[in-house]
Amino acid sequence: MKPLLSLDRVSVSRDGRNVLDKLSLSLAAGERLALIGDNGVGKTTLLRTIVGLEPASGEITAFGINCRNESDFRKIRAKAAYLFQNPDDQLFCPTVIDDVAFGPLNLGLSRQEAMELSNGLLHDLGLGHLAGRITHHLSGGEKRLVSLAAVLAMQPQVLLLDEPTNALDEKHLERMLAILSAQKIAMIIVSHDWEILERLTDRAVVLRNGKLLPAMLHRHSQWSEQVHLHYVEAEGSAL
């Protein structure tokens, strides 16, 4: 079966250095991939590159489309939803329901269809009480959950999540984890919280010096409950 997403020898240069250096990656349907790395190593750049928000060399193929121009990437962004690290970068409409309905409207649904879908989704996610709220009056945790609802409203095949649980209190963290755990779609999740990645993902890679290294998140419960990282041998050149 062909992967949903495939990057082949993709490079992104910035200030004279390769942030991504002939990097290859594939993501299968339903697969949940943890993307790990130090601050500033290029994890966000990689997510942005997948949806065409960074100029890159190499080959990016997604959903059967060999992406060569902005027209191709617009089709990709309808199926690969990117959750920004800062929810204020994602939410710009007056009310929550308007923010959630924005994506479906942009995909061609009528206003009635978009509102019905968005209200139903908010209800299903346990966020129905927020529908009429003014977005900029929400707490940080509420904004993060609403931004997730906004990308899910586009009914994507892949979620690209940039630090989705960062700075959430316990209540909003558990709500976020419950929502993500219930999704039956592929994901790439960037996070510094290995405990959360171990709960949500089934494969891990580490971005270092522009390359991806295969890894495994693991815990030895008989010695320690703390999750730690093992590097593993790759079975071929593509991850």
Swiss-Prot record:
GO MF annotations in UniProt: ATP binding; ATP hydrolysis activity; ATPase-coupled transmembrane transporter activity
Presence of keyword 4Fe-4S: no
Major subcellular site: membrane
EC number, as in UniProt: 7.-.-.-
One Pfam family named in its UniProt record: ABC_tran
Residues at which ATP binds: 37-44
Keywords: ATP-binding, Cell inner membrane, Cell membrane, Membrane, Nucleotide-binding, Translocase, Transport
Listed Gene3D superfamilies: P-loop containing nucleotide triphosphate hydrolases (3.40.50.300)
The protein's role, per its UniProt record: Probably part of an ABC transporter complex. Responsible for energy coupling to the transport system.
Name the UniProt record assigns to this protein: Putative ABC transporter ATP-binding protein BR1368/BS1330_I1363
